[in-house]
Curated annotation (Swiss-Prot):
Disulfide bonds: none annotated. Pathway: Glycan metabolism; Vi-antigen biosynthesis; Capsule biogenesis; capsule polysaccharide biosynthesis. This is Vi polysaccharide biosynthesis protein TviA. GO terms for biological process: capsule polysaccharide biosynthetic process; regulation of DNA-templated transcription.
Length: 179
């Protein structure tokens, strides 16, 4: 896989913004080895696969996440050594530049910590992949060897962690998915 400075590669506007941030940061730190990841409802399915194959990437990763997917971004911040920071999409460009340019090698950038009632874990990521990939309940029952009631409970628990009715609502605009 070849990456320049932003992901997903088809998000041109995000790429232009990421290039501007990298340009400003490089003037301060002389480092251009950054990869900015845009985590939102459009990139969610691909991001689940991207972060499982991330060991090939030798770049410093900064995630810009929508508010709804912030628990997932925080999970990747703690689990992936390449990920150094997570910013909400509403964070100003100047704040991102300031925080990234002050980054010390080997440290994570801690931004405002909104307290999330639920933490995402590895099992949730696996479940999310299956629930969002349009797998039917019977297929999921066979794969996980569990009853339908267990599958429905898992789906409900995952939805509650993200504040939606069903996991598939994570792929819809925020105004449609409110509880």
């Amino acid at each position: 896989m070849r990456f320049h400075h932003f992901w997903p590669p088809n998000d041109i506007y995000f790429g232009v913004g990421a290039a501007g941030i990298i340009e400003e940061v490089s003037l301060i730190t002389n480092d251009r080895n950054y990869l900015f990841v845009n985590l939102n409802r459009y990139s969610l399915l691909n991001a689940l696969n991207f972060f499982t194959r991330m060991s090939d990437i030798n770049k410093i990763i900064v995630i810009i996440s929508s508010s709804r997917l912030m628990p997932l971004a925080r999970f990747w911040l703690t689990e992936c050594k390449n990920v150094i920071a997570v910013f909400d999409a509403a964070t100003s460009v100047q704040d991102i530049i300031r925080n990234v340019s002050q980054h010390q090698s080997g440290e994570k950038i801690l931004t405002e910590q909104r307290d999330y009632r639920f933490r995402i874990n590895r099992k949730d990521i696996v479940k999310m992949k299956y629930f969002l990939s349009e797998s039917g309940m019977e297929e999921l029952q066979d794969r996980f060897m569990n009853s339908s009631s267990t599958m429905y409970r898992w789906r409900k628990e995952l939805a509650v962690k993200f504040g939606v009715r069903e996991p598939r609502y994570l792929l819809l605009p925020d105004s449609v998915t409110l509880l």
